[in-house]
């Protein structure tokens, strides 16, 4: 981090937790003085549109109006990823001010994105929590679940199954475990789909497609309110927002369901 001078120039990333400051739905751009950033701490984390991209250290009090990162999923993917990166870096810096080994204060390293203990020298890098997310298909049907956190009296969002990868577990094992734990369904033909940084606050969603193998839906009631098979040609419940990897998985799987039905 450096103390910003009045003429420091570029795009500016300001965060408050998972919220960001935007001007007309875009990152503020210009010199530090014009955006009231002079004297604040910031670090350059790359470039955006051929100009320096600065991440400003979070302030305890800030009268600017911030918008939730969740409300920005419709932005172009590269822009959403830039915003997610800023949120995750500031989360890391805010939660690693002290050494996890000896408890003394840390400081940022100069040559890489990390913090180092000023007492014992222990170095810590940004923590990324890997999570799997999977769409399961059975012929021309897709398995969708209404998680308890998504439930509402009107039904709420139905989405794909997801969960954190456990210690010592492969992504493939995590997918099979999560699907079976939450729905009692066994799967096969597992294949990688894609990934998405998920800065709430520091996950990496790794997406898969899978086919049904066996079993009847048996809910993990502590996690899942409802789960059903939905045919591609029937009315669907409320789905995750456009821009999420969950929505992309659902779209691709519904296309596979449609193709399967045409081949019957």
Swiss-Prot record:
A GO molecular function held by the record: NAD+ diphosphatase activity
Organism: Haemophilus influenzae (strain PittEE)
Names of the cofactor(s): Mg(2+); Mn(2+); Zn(2+)
One example of a Gene Ontology biological process annotation: NADP catabolic process
Keyword Thylakoid recorded: no
Catalyses which reaction(s): a 5'-end NAD(+)-phospho-ribonucleoside in mRNA + H2O = a 5'-end phospho-adenosine-phospho-ribonucleoside in mRNA + beta-nicotinamide D-ribonucleotide + 2 H(+); NAD(+) + H2O = beta-nicotinamide D-ribonucleotide + AMP + 2 H(+); NADH + H2O = reduced beta-nicotinamide D-ribonucleotide + AMP + 2 H(+)
UniProtKB keywords: Hydrolase, Magnesium, Manganese, Metal-binding, NAD, Zinc
Residues holding Zn(2+): 99, 102, 117, 120
Cofactor binding remark: Divalent metal cations. Mg(2+) or Mn(2+). Binds 1 zinc ion per subunit.
NCBIfam families, A to Z: PRK00241.1 (NF001299)
Enzyme kind, highest EC tier: hydrolase
Stored PANTHER family: NAD-CAPPED RNA HYDROLASE NUDT12, NUDIX HYDROLASE, NUDC SUBFAMILY
Protein name as it appears in the record: NAD-capped RNA hydrolase NudC
Described function: mRNA decapping enzyme that specifically removes the nicotinamide adenine dinucleotide (NAD) cap from a subset of mRNAs by hydrolyzing the diphosphate linkage to produce nicotinamide mononucleotide (NMN) and 5' monophosphate mRNA. The NAD-cap is present at the 5'-end of some mRNAs and stabilizes RNA against 5'-processing. Has preference for mRNAs with a 5'-end purine. Catalyzes the hydrolysis of a broad range of dinucleotide pyrophosphates.
Listed GO CC annotations: cytosol
């Amino acid at each position: 981090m450096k103390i910003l001078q009045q003429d420091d120039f570029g795009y500016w990333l300001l965060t408050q937790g998972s919220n960001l400051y935007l001007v007309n739905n875009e990152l503020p751009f210009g010199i530090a003085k014009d955006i009231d950033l002079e004297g604040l701490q910031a670090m350059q984390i790359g470039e955006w549109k051929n100009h320096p991209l600065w991440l400003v250290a979070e302030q305890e009090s800030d009268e600017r109006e911030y918008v939730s990162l969740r409300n920005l999923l419709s932005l172009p993917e590269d822009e959403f990823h830039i915003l997610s990166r800023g949120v995750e870096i500031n989360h890391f810096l805010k939660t690693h001010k002290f050494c996890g080994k000896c408890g003394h204060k840390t400081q940022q390293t100069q040559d890489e994105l990390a913090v180092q203990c000023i007492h014992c020298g222990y170095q810590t890098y940004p923590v990324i929590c890997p999570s799997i997310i999977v769409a399961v298909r059975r012929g021309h049907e897709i398995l969708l679940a209404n998680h308890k956190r998504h439930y509402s009296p009107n039904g709420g969002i139905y989405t794909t199954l997801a969960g954190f990868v456990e210690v010592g577990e492969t992504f493939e094992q995590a997918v099979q475990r999560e699907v079976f734990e939450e729905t009692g369904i066994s799967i096969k033909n597992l294949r990688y789909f894609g990934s998405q940084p998920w800065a709430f606050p520091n996950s990496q969603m790794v997406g898969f497609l899978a086919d049904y193998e066996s079993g009847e839906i048996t809910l993990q009631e502590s996690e899942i309110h409802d789960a059903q098979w939905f045919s591609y040609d029937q009315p669907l419940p409320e789905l995750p927002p456009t821009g999420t990897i969950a929505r992309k998985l659902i779209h691709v799987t519904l296309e596979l369901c449609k193709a399967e039905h045409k081949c019957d």
